[in-house]
């Protein structure tokens, strides 16, 4: 057992002790959001504020360091910043979970495992993506190198999910394999983070740059966090693309903290601190790789290109979905020249993009947050307290 697995084992034991300690706590009409991404939480908080008068419960947000940008949304709701490595933070967070009849989370949190033997609290997983091009959970290829104790711990967390929200039947199939869940656990409410793409507001960021916008939003490589590759150089933007485009780069938070050298220039800007949905709305073109961002951007029916310079390596080390190249709405381009060929010489296939979006966003209709909050309301009313 490596050091990381050993730490996780002690972490799990500590959580189990807290679970026993707080078992007598009776839940109230309270909904807790446990989040490490801002997108779903932002949508749910805004919807809650808009419909609070018709809902019987209060909301508390537990957020980690990757979701600190949520602070501006938290007025009017309870909140607590959780350092997952701080024992007292964990103690308070678990107590808040136990005081709630409904918990909604957006990621893998070991602390939800304490809810496994707590039928009076419903745990709903909304996940942080409305589609997936890479394998995760029980399907993750790195599991083959992990000790059995790790896999057992993962399953313990997945068993804490009473329900998982889905935006499509395609993603439902992914979740069933990745989390080991059944059809009866699937909530076809759509995915809250997609609601914003149905709002008819003009892109707020469009005026910031005088040129057309290419947004580059790559996923992270957990086996190489210190480097990333840009799809175009300043010279290519100037000459091959006639200086018509700005290249905006949105890096994953996990990568950003490892990148020290600046890559910015006149036509290349780092926009990693800006909200994804604002950038997607402003962008004319998206370039990505194995990220889940295309599933959101497809709702806007604009061109997507795939810069997959390390496709074979990524598939071997991290694991892509089966038939990746036939699933994506476009060609997998191994270098900048292939990207330029696709961008400058191939017409945009709007119908193909719409089919892709319809397949992966079939239940996301712009009202997913409201639908999920209404479902939580029914669980509040039907929640029976565990016997003493």
Task: Indicate where each model-derived feature is located.
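N-terminal pre-catalytic "stem/leader" segment of glycosyltransferase-like enzymes
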Residues: 1-91
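A nucleotide-sugar donor-handling region in carbohydrate enzymes
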Residues: 2-20, 133-135, 139-225, 253-256, ...
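Conserved catalytic-core segment of nucleotide-activated headgroup transferases in glycan assembly
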Residues: 39-52, 177-178, 186-261, 333, ...
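Extended catalytic core of nucleotide-activated donor transferases of GT-like folds
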Residues: 78-147
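Donor nucleotide-activated moiety binding/catalytic core segment of transferases
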Residues: 82-98, 253-295
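A donor-sugar binding/catalytic signature common to diverse glycosyltransferases
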Residues: 102-109, 114-116, 124-127, 274-318
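A short beta-strand/loop micro-motif in the catalytic core of glycosyltransferases
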Residues: 103-104, 162-168, 248, 286-287
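Catalytic binding pocket for nucleotide-activated donors in carbohydrate/polymer assembly enzymes
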Residues: 292-360
